[in-house]
Amino acid sequence: MSNQLFQQNLDDKKGPQPGGPYLIQILFKEPVDMPDKETMTAVIEKHIGSTECFCYDKQMAGFAAQEHIAEFKDGKCPVQLMVMKCDRFKGKGFDAFLMSQMWDCQEDRERIFRECKYQVVATDMLAAALPALEHANLDADFLEAQAELYPTCEAFYFQNCGKLFLAEDVRSHQIEGSDRFIRFGVNVRFFNIEGTEDMLIDTVGMSTLFLPDLQYHFHNMDPNWVVNHAYNVASYILEHDNPIQDGETIDGVAEDRKSVV
């Protein structure tokens, strides 16, 4: 853990916003061509079900996920999945604080940002109108489609939560169901509080699904226990549609202990 000090910005308007897009930056060492329309449609359809390509040109490709319908007061329409053309990746905006919380890629993160000069951006649109569980599974399926479409990519960066993964870790995982979103779309951050023995752990990424993120303020405990607890609680909240109400208890971090929420 770095001893570098960071000051919390309580007025951050640039961080993840509730219901914001699930934005994936696919990173490359060399430029890549966009796969042809037929290939993209077939691969995305294999992962998410019935798909219609409504846009394909030199700038982007757009796909309607016809089995995932976003409903609004004035109508309904399929969720849209967008894939942009390959463009330069300048690595801007990844400050020391963001880098410090990339726990899944600690040994490779600096090399990735140094060597990767190109990116493809993929994102969803209108998915915020879906139920949380459906939204999570759709985003996870869309990620797996991108991993198949771009076999030469080096890494994936998930803007909604600040996680960075080597491409091989995305392709080789054995996780199923909505826990795929927890793995790639939710980050658990860790902080030491200056001048005290207190520690703080929080989650980032649940708000993408309009679900609550978590925060733990503690001391005299192994932070790894708390990290695991946070991931387990996040998974439970997603799988069961946020069933925990204010004042209720959940299993605590320590054995035979309950925590009030």
Question: Where are these predicted regions, by residue range?
Answer:
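Internal, hydrophobic cores of structured domains that mediate oligomerization or house catalytic pockets
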Residues: M84-N187
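Structural alpha-beta junctions
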Residues: E45-Y56, D141-F156, Y236-Q245
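Active-site-proximal structural scaffolding
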Residues: Q17, A136-D139, V226
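Short, compositionally biased low-complexity segments
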Residues: K14-Q17, R109-Q119, D198-L209
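N-terminal low-complexity, intrinsically disordered segments
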Residues: V32-R111
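Conserved aromatic-histidine-acidic binding/catalytic patches
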Residues: F28, V32, A127-H135, F218-W225
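Aromatic/basic-lined ligand-recognition segments
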Residues: Q159-V261
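N-terminal alpha-helical "arm" segments
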Residues: M1-H47
